[in-house]
Structure formats: structure tokens, C-alpha cells
Amino acid sequence: MKKNLMLIFGGVSFEHEISLRSAYGIYSSLLKLDKYNVFSVFVDKVTGIWYLLDSVPSSAELIKRHTTSIVNFIPGCGIFVNNKSLEIDVIFPIIHGRTGEDGAIQGFVKMMDIPCVGAGILGSAISINKYFCKVLLKSFNIPVVSFIGFKKDDYILNKEGIKEDINNKLNYPVIVKPSVLGSSIGINVAYNVSQIEKYIEEAFEYDLTVVVEKFIKAREIECAVIGNDQIKIFTPGEIVVQDFIFYDYDAKYSTVPGDSIVFNIPAHLDMKHLLDIKEYAFLTYKYLELRGMARIDFLISKDTNLLYVNEVNTIPGFTDISMFAKMCEHDGLSYESLVDKLITLAFESYKKRKDKIDFTRLES
């Protein structure tokens, strides 16, 4: 008997359009698997309203919003559309960035008591926050590039002091990032003090916390990881960027792989780097309490050959050019099998939690 799966995509997020592309790929795979009844739920970018669609369309222009298809969630009661109950066995969120990748939807689904694909509340919330993620990894002696972080209120009160810290502790050039955002949105490289203020202000347009890191010329390595208690680390891949300073938003989504962007799977690594990447991927996954899946990004300095953990993505892209599925496929796990495996992991994680915790103690 087929399970009822709800695929949630879109979202009130700067990465809304990327989510649509990822959802289309996953939806197509679910149709090929023919193991699930798929309920496609689109979250409007402006209003945040959830709509049940007939399918995941290939482009945003084809999405139709009907008031009769609005999805309502009532914890303890169920999911309803037009006063009709939906029996959902598992939820697959593919909203990138805020509300989808930051623990919000994970907490909501947990309140609904439904298995959910991917990381839980804690792992999602820490991983998406570049500042706290780096602080935590550094505390476990996992190498990260030198950085400082600060909130908008602190910057307003001590602008010159923070700029002085950037100059003294990091030295230029530096890379300026919003703390909670993905897909390289709002990221800029500042080469001198005259640029830093402009880029900090721009980063604050996306988040209330900014991270400034020492900019290094580096090889960009990505590593796919799946699993719960037992994890599998796939062969790392490398993104070779020719015409961009780093792998920014335009390079990721506005450029067709070719002369400017080359994906090497496997990445050309010496044995030490390969083993270190797999070890740090394992430890990062463990310390952040991740489950389901993650893409862990690394940097290898072209000057010093040193390795750093860069960022962690708990809902990596599933578009036709995304590296996550390609790395899994290289090691023999097809796109369709990957999607199916992630759903299985969601059921396993849910069952373990139910078996481990005696919920009868809550009964009066």
C-alpha cells in the first residue's frame, strides 16, 4: 500500500525560486518510484499561505493559487484542505533557507507528530547559522577560517571598533556574509576598509547578524552525507570556478556548467586531504546532531594547502545542476534511490524517537 507523502516547497525565503527547481526534480523522481501518493504543497513567497497543488509545475508561472486549496494544520487534530482531512504519513520539506532549513518547519512537523525527511530542529537551526555553526565546530577543534560575527545593534553602537577588529584580526581581503542565508546570497568580498562598510550594510539587509571571514583563494570541495546513527560519506566533488571570484549566486544558478564552471566528481585530492575531508565530514555531522542528509562544504587554501570546513547545508539543492545528488550518483546511488532512501531514514528516525521515549508518562 502506498504511503501518503507531502512535498513542501517554495517558502517565504530568498531561496524560493531554487526551492521550486529542487521540488520539481524530487517530484519527478517520486513519480518514477511510484511508491508514494504525493501531495504537493506550495508556500507562497509573499503571503506565506500554503496551497495544495495537483502537481509540482516545471515553472513558477504555472502555479495556481485557489482559496479552496489552502492547507490548514491543527496540531493534535490533523491536516485539512477545504474542510477535508488529509492523512499524511511523511513530510518531505524542500524549502531552502529561512522557515525550511532553520528548524522552523522541523518543529512544526514535530508538533504535528509526522515523520520528516532531513535534520531535526537543533541540527537545522545550528547549521544554517554560519556564526554559531563556526563557533561550535571551532570548539571541537574542527578547522574553520578565521572569522568574527556581530549583530546589527552592536555594529550601530560600535561601528569603528568592529571595523578596527576586522582590520587587526583578519586583515584584508575579507568575505562578508549574512549569518542565516544560503546560496551565496548577500555575500561580497571586501578588499579594503573603504568597501567593508558598504558590504556590511548590504549583508544586514538579509539578516540581523553578519559574519566576516578572512578571504582565502581556495579550492571548493563538497561532500554529501546521508544517514541517522549510521552514516554514509560519499566521494567528494570539486567546483572549479574560472570566471568568478568565488562560487556565488550567479555562478551557481545563472551559469551553465562548462568553461566557467566545472564539476569534478571525484575531486582530484591527495590521500591525506581525502581522508581528512571524510573524517571532518563525519565529525561535523555527529557534533551538529544531523540526520537524514547534509552537504558539507570545504575549502582548501591554494597558498597553504590547509583544509577548512566552510558551511553545512541540511537541505541541499536538488536541481538538475546540484552537486549533492551527483556525488551520490557517482557512488552508485541514483537520484530516485536517494530520494527513496531519505524517506526511509525519516521513518526510521521517527520510529526510534517513539520507541525511545515513553510518551505514556505524559498521560495523567
From Swiss-Prot:
Keyword Phosphoprotein carried by entry: no
Name of the protein described by the UniProt record: D-alanine--D-alanine ligase
Family membership noted in the UniProt record: Belongs to the D-alanine--D-alanine ligase family.
Cofactor(s) of this protein: Mg(2+); Mn(2+)
A Pfam family assignment: Dala_Dala_lig_N
Function as written in the Swiss-Prot or TrEMBL entry: Cell wall formation.
Example GO biological process: cell wall organization
Root EC class: ligase
Disulfide bridges in this chain: none
Ligand binding (ATP): 167-222
Gene source species: Borrelia duttonii (strain Ly)
